[in-house]
Structures are given as structure tokens and as C-alpha cells.
From Swiss-Prot:
Compositionally biased spans, kind Basic and acidic residues: 126-142
Species per Swiss-Prot/TrEMBL record: Saccharomyces cerevisiae (strain ATCC 204508 / S288c) (Baker's yeast)
Modified-residue entries (Phosphothreonine), positions: 151
GO molecular function annotations of the record: unfolded protein binding
Protein modification: Ubiquitinated by the NOT4 E3 ligase and the UBC4 E2 ubiquitin conjugation enzyme.
Compartment(s) where it occurs, according to its Swiss-Prot or TrEMBL record: Cytoplasm; Nucleus
Described function: Component of the nascent polypeptide-associated complex (NAC), a dynamic component of the ribosomal exit tunnel, protecting the emerging polypeptides from interaction with other cytoplasmic proteins to ensure appropriate nascent protein targeting.
Gene3D superfamilies reported in the protein's UniProt record: Nascent polypeptide-associated complex domain
Family matches, as PANTHER family: TRANSCRIPTION FACTOR BTF3 FAMILY MEMBER
Protein name: Nascent polypeptide-associated complex subunit beta-1
Amino acid sequence: MPIDQEKLAKLQKLSANNKVGGTRRKLNKKAGSSAGANKDDTKLQSQLAKLHAVTIDNVAEANFFKDDGKVMHFNKVGVQVAAQHNTSVFYGLPQEKNLQDLFPGIISQLGPEAIQALSQLAAQMEKHEAKAPADAEKKDEAIPELVEGQTFDADVE
């Protein structure tokens, strides 16, 4: 079947102006949700239920002392304990803080190691403070006292 070139050119011209077929709608991808974290929480809750964990209410804060002197501080915390299995679970968002940031309210929570570290820190601070005034006096000796009417312009030239 022969194709008429004139009709073909006319059809191509019309098809260039008119789109054939519908517009494709972009499908919104499902946003990444916290379904994975929620799934982990449900697994954890089921395991705690198997251990007969008991929820402890009215816990204001919890602090975990790390070896490097930092403290993991839980401000609002949920606690579940399974004493027969020696298991404790703490829920919340921890903030890593320095030990100095939590004073003086944290002193009652410190163990013997932390109190010893605190006394060493205080001794270091006292040594540093005693050394600082001596350094300041040495710096003052190098600075000449200004006398009214005396200029150093001649010495500079």
C-alpha cells in the first residue's frame, strides 16, 4: 500500500501539536516512615512481656556515667524492670553532657569512683588557679609603667 507523503506530512504536523495519550501523573512516593523503628519497639515490648517486666512510674531522670567523664542524661525517662532476669530498660532520648554541666543536683547520684574523679578534678582546678596568678605577675613584669609626660617616640626612630 503506497503512502501519500502529503497526508503523512499533514498528520505529523497535527500530531506535533496534539499529544496522543494522557498525561502521566507522577505518583507520590511513600515517605520513609518510622515503621522499622516501631516494629523494633513492638518486638522489644513482646520480649519484655515474656520476662514479666514491671513499669516503674515517676522516674524524673536517669544518668549513665561513661568512662570518659561524660554523662548520658535522660530527662524524661520510662523504666521497665524484670528483676528476676536482672534486666532494666530505659526509654527516652539521651543527651550527652559533661559532668560539670549537671552540678550540683547530681552529687547524690555519684558513686565512689565518680566522687574520686571529682576530687581529682577539683585538685587540678586548684593547681591551675594557683598557677594562673603567678603567670599573671610574670606578664606584668614585662610591661613597663607609663609615666606622664614621657614619650617613646625618640626610641622608635
